[in-house]
Structure formats: C-alpha cells, structure tokens
Amino acid sequence: LLPCGDNHCYIVIDRKTGEELKRVNALDIEGVALLFVGQILQLKNGNLLICNWYGHTKDATVDEPQLIEIDKNGKVVWSLHDKKNVGKISAACYIDNFRLPNLK
C-alpha cells in the first residue's frame, strides 16, 4: 500500500515486481473524497484505515472525515469526522484490545 499524499490517491503494488495492481483516486470511494492521503493501515479483518489529512493550511475549510475505514469492496464502514476536537490526522496506530486507562 502506497499512500500518495498530495496526489489524493493510494496505490496497491506487487512487492515482487513493482507492478501497480490498483489505484484509488480522490473520488473513487463513495461518500468521501481523499485529500492528502497519509498513512494507511490494513486491519486484521482486511479493511483499510486511511488517514485523510486536510492540509498545510491552519484554517482549512474542507468537510471530509479525517479517518476513513473501508472494506474489501471499497465501501466506507466507519469514519471519524471531528475537526473541532481532533484536528488533522496524518498517521494512526491500531491497537488490538485497547482499553482506556482510568482517568479519574
């Protein structure tokens, strides 16, 4: 998986040959637009978690989710869309069975 940043896409390549197997462009995922494609994680269930960074501009006004999870068919199954509380996301880490610490 190659996130292609400002090209607003990601590419799947064959690691042995370098051949491009698939390219997903900015408007290929129904219901969302890819912006600066940051890190992409493949989850245990095969879904992809895409960091959809919205740029260098402090006051960017784009209205797209910061994280997008898509299934094997390229359909959105979950997204995080909370710029007020979370802000820009360029990378993520998926932790299996993560539990929040007791913050009280």
Regions found by a protein language model. Name each.
Residues 1-104:
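Histidine-/acidic-rich catalytic cores in large beta-rich domains
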